[in-house]
Amino acid sequence: MKFNFSLIVSIVLISFSTLMSCQTRTEQEQKPNIILFYVDDMGWQDCSLPFHSETTRLNKIYHTPNMEALAKEGMKFTQAYAYAVCSPSRISLMTGMNGARHQVTNWTLRMNISPDPERKDITPPQWNMNGMTMGEDVPLTIQAITMPQLLRESGYRTIHAGKAHFGAVGTPGENPLNLGFDVNIGGHAAGGPGSYHGEYNYSAAWRNADRIWDVPGLEKYHGTDTYLTEALT
């Protein structure tokens, strides 16, 4: 889903729990920590870290040292495919399925309502407009075991921060806690925030817009000058 404001980033933090008493310290240390960024509208050349065999002209425009450091200390994948809008790409990352398999082929928001504009000359195909669930029998969803759930079963603590956009309002998939995450910070059904500003309570109410965009769970920062990025952090 495209917006005329800055990049929307959600971060998945997956750390191996040190509370697994049945495992030795050596076994625990073999489990790597995982940080996965879901970034909207970011091209493969929109950073200083090259994802090609050589640095491109556009790579030289940007300065993203943290991405370079993460790639140097971790693992970089250079062959991938992303969909034109966010929900399909996010669900593919969560499930390992491509769009033809999970059939979430557009961004999701309202239950049983497609965001596609109505046209008299075209009948849109049936698709999973309610997003994804993990076991619940919800119409027009893809039911699948998620990556965070599998990691949690392997002893990881899973944290989601920022934009979620995995399932429509009123379905279990709107809440990352129902998709294998232990902690959810600000993630909900909408594909963007009502506002980035704490003085507006991260809500669209100040411009008389739909409250469906309000960011949940950040009430302690309401009425302050805390920018959304800082509140999530």
Q: Predicted regions: what is each one?
A:
Residues 55-90, 96-101, 157-159, 179-188:
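Short, structured active-site-proximal loop/turn typified by the sulfatase FGly-forming signature C/S-X-P-X-R
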Residues 8-18:
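Bacterial N-terminal signal peptides
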Residues 109-157, 164-233:
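Formylglycine-dependent
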Residues 27-75, 164:
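Active-site-proximal N-terminal segment of extracellular/periplasmic enzymes that hydrolyze or transfer
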